[in-house]
């Protein structure tokens, strides 16, 4: 542990904490927290948090958060968040968010959001959003949105939208 309050309370074996308050409370075995407040509260085994406030509050086992505020609050087992505020709040198990604001708020189990603001607000279980603002708001379970603003707002469950602005608003 290196830095003020880094690895302060209950740091597991072979855990690494570098930065002010990094991994400061309940950092599990083999986990890594680098950056101010990275992995600060309850970091699971083999979890990785790199960046200011990355994986800050409740990061699950094998979860990865890289970037400013990535995986900030409640990142579940095996979830991956890469980019500014990617997977920021409530990222489900095995969910993946890559890109600026991708999967920012409530990403379901096994969902994938890749691209600027893709799957940003409420992405359902096993949903896929690829492209800038694809599946941006309220993407249903098992849905697919590929392309710029594809299924941007309110895509229903088990729906598919492929192409620029395909199924842009309220796809059933």
Language-model segments: which ranges?
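Glycine- and small/polar-enriched repetitive beta-structure motifs of secreted/surface proteins
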Residues: 1-172
